[in-house]
Regions:
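Short pre-catalytic strand/loop immediately N-terminal to key active-site residues, enriched for Gly-Thr
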Residues: 1-3, 147-149
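DPxDG-like acidic metal-binding loop motif
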Residues: 2-28, 42
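Glycine-rich beta-strand-to-loop/alpha-helix junction loops that act as flexible
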Residues: 4-5, 152-156
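Glycine/threonine-rich beta-strand-loop-alpha-helix active-site module
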Residues: 21-62
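Conserved, helical-rich catalytic subdomain that frames metal- and/or nucleotide-binding sites
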Residues: 45, 49-148, 163-169, 173-175
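Conserved SAM-binding loop
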Residues: 150-151, 160
Length: 176
């Protein structure tokens, strides 16, 4: 849920490109990265992006308004493959999808609360069914004042999005 091996792969591609003076463009590194993993192109590009397809079709976006995140791993890890297998059997009508266009508008306006309201992770329900602690952790972060609490990737890390450093630090102090 936090990039893991794909982040390592992206960093390795960038590092080797520089070390060996290969002079590959970012687009070329993204194409190579896709052969390693679907989210490697995103981690090669960096910044805030809209990802489509399997994650290889990237559109760079306006940076997010200043915000603070509190990361929390309330339970043991989950198998990404297992989560996606379960997701594939989930009815599309039951999924809370991100509101991508509203998110892009919020980014352009620098509107953090609107950005938070537009965000969703379609894998949350599947992962929470396997690890109920995730749902409790999300509720706890919201109780502690998060503008939005979400799970990263397929889990098991969750995060709270806060509008100030003070609010984030207070929430961190309030975690069990």
């Amino acid at each position: 849920g936090m990039g893991g091996g794909s982040a390592d792969a992206g960093a390795a591609l960038i590092g080797l490109n520089r070390l060996w003076n290969l002079n590959f463009s970012t687009a070329e590194l993204e194409r190579i990265g896709l052969t390693v993993g679907a989210d490697v192109p995103f981690l090669v590009r960096g910044g805030l992006c809209r990802a489509e397809g399997v994650g290889e079709q990237l559109t760079s976006l306006t940076p997010a308004p200043k915000c603070w995140l509190v990361l929390w791993q309330p339970c043991d890890g989950l198998s990404t493959g297992e989560i996606f297998t379960a997701f594939d059997t989930t009815s599309a009508e039951t999924l809370a999808r991100p509101q991508t266009l509203r998110a892009q508008e919020a980014l352009l306006a620098g509107d953090l609360p609107a950005l938070a309201a537009s965000m969703n992770n379609v894998l949350e329900g599947v992962s929470a069914a396997k690890r109920p602690q995730l749902e409790r952790a999300l509720h706890r972060l919201e109780e502690l004042g998060a503008l939005r609490a979400m799970m990263t990737g397929s889990g098991s890390v969750v995060y709270g999005l806060f509008g100030s450093e003070g609010a984030a630090n207070a929430a961190l102090s309030g975690l069990d």
